[in-house]
Amino acid sequence: MAAIALVVTAFGAFASVAAANGGGGQVNIVRQGAAPSKVPANTHYFKTIQAAVNASKSGDWVLIEPGIYYEEVKVTSAQSGIWIRGMNRNKVIIDGQGKVGNGLEIYKASNVWVENLTVRNFEFGKTGCLVEECGNDIWWNGGSGSKKIGAHGWYGSYLTAYDTGTTGGYGIFTDNETEGSWENIYASGFADSGIYIGACQECNARVSGAIMENNALGYSGSNAGGKLLLENSIYRHNTVGIAPNSENPGDGPPPQDGECGRPNIENPTPTNPNPTPIIKTTNIPRCTIIRNNIITENNNLTAPVNGSTGVAPWGAGVELPGDYADLIESNIIANNPTDGVMAFEYPNPFTPENGFAGTLFFQLAGNRVSNNVFVHNGSRGGAFTGDVMLAGGFSEIELFKELGYPESHSVNNCVSNNLFTGATFPAKIEGTWGCQNKTTPSPGGGEAAVDYLVGLQIEADTIRAETPPVGQPAPPPQQSMPNPCQGVPKNPLCS
């Protein structure tokens, strides 16, 4: 595992070094005021960010002077390989003013860096431009919905995304792309998630130094796996802290699978998008790693939600719905009212309009929860609340048997070497189940766990009906890039 982690960490470091040493290229400066009378040959001035982007090609820089910019910005494949950098994280602001649209979208453009700026208040609509299509503040879009990888190389640092309304979709978002990193980022107030990585079976990605708060989900990652590292970050005051998940159809192809060496699937068949992984032992190489994070007080039922996040079980630090081969290690997981880690099998979609036709039954297999510190989780009380809840056996439910639910492969999940201060399910989980059991516990023949999860959904709905979600507060200033001229060719801003 150390070698795997080293590879992923080194990849993230490479991205930072490359960004810091951009070398030559044209410098396109965005200034709302008048340009100086004399400028170097390699420098051009523009009044809008979009105009500066349009004039850029691979190796060029877009430097943005402080100001509030009321525009949507789109980067296309013609601008692959450019840098977009604000000169002050807190004073360079792309402002959506609560209108429907996307803030900064990088569409099928590879190797694009975005750094040191703020994007805020872009919304999704009730009709027309819906969630996922709009309401995304910073979006590396490799071809959303295509089920294919459409771009490579997405890099962001010193970024702030926030929404003070109730219809912001995603803060910092990538799908259908591989090979990227985010460092020193912040997101709050989003009805889906603060950060999202999706639709990459082999993501080759790293997130570090993130602060995610006041979102429906701090992190969400549908069908994202392989080499994927979430580390050294804070997830607090969300409805749910971290939720990697399998999903169908969604950001396909499914499932979410953290086992090393999982290929990106091209042209999956409609009836079997990606075969269910068969996990034969607890001793498998895991490359999707959630480590060294603080995951605390994810109990915020005033945060905005959408149709998907509004039905998620609330109050957990980490949720693993239908996940395979993820490693949760060396985190502090504290003060989450339902469960520190909540892991369960996941039929999805759960209640389609045409019965269960088209449903995929995602198992829970090969995951490991080790060396974490759990403190004061489960304050809601009741069965299944506490530090860790591990539930399988849904195939034993009579309804699912009648509908052809497959034999359970929810095996070889492992819980070891954690510090617990609360209850676990099963009780004393490391002694009774731990890493020595091939199967996953099935409380009450599976029905009891389903009742618990559905009960949390109903509970959240009831609370929201009495006290509807509200816009979350704007954040305080965040740390700006120490030297925004680092690596930039000489120009009037960087002499």
Enumerate the predicted regions with their spans.
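Right-handed parallel beta-helix/beta-solenoid
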Residues: G12, V17-A51, A55
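Extracellular beta-strand-rich solenoid/capping regions of secreted or surface-exposed proteins
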Residues: Q50, N54-K57, I68-R85, I93-N116, ...
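Acidic, glycine- and Ser/Thr-rich low-complexity intrinsically disordered tracts
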Residues: E353, F362, N377-S495
